[in-house]
């Protein structure tokens, strides 16, 4: 027997200050009544054959976003329900020079998520950026 009394997932953004609004930054996200949680491993600019990109930061950001979208959609989840996005990069300065690509993607897909950006010494092979997400439904 199945219970047909489904509750709708609720997502609440917590922003106690105003400064983060101009940066597409969210201080916290509260989620209630979830049906499932998807923990997405770090997605990078690796092609369908498993080859790591040696392209510039801008190109790798675009490819990493495409791969992240593919995993999320293949899992039956929606981009707008990303609640956490961690960004790892080997160069914060290069990442922030191209950060508008990520901000525009977030706005276009109505994503409001908690985030952390970390500069790391290295990523796999020739990769310079990695996107790790948590998605709910």
What are these regions (language model features)?
Residues 1-66, 70-83, 89-137:
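N-terminal presequence-like segments and the immediate start of the first folded domain
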């Amino acid at each position: 027997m199945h219970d047909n009394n489904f509750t709708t997932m609720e997502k609440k953004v917590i922003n106690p200050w105003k400064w983060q609004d101009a940066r597409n930054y969210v201080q916290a996200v509260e989620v209630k009544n979830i049906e499932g949680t998807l923990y997405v491993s770090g997605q990078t600019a690796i092609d369908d054959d498993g080859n790591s990109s040696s392209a510039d930061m801008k190109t790798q950001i675009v490819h990493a976003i495409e791969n992240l979208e593919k995993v999320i959609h293949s899992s039956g989840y929606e981009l707008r329900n990303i609640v956490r996005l961690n960004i790892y990069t080997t160069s914060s300065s290069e990442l922030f020079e191209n950060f508008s690509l990520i901000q525009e993607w977030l706005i276009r897909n109505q994503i409001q998520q908690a985030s952390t950006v970390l500069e790391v010494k290295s990523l796999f092979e020739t990769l310079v950026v990695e996107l790790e997400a948590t998605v709910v439904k």
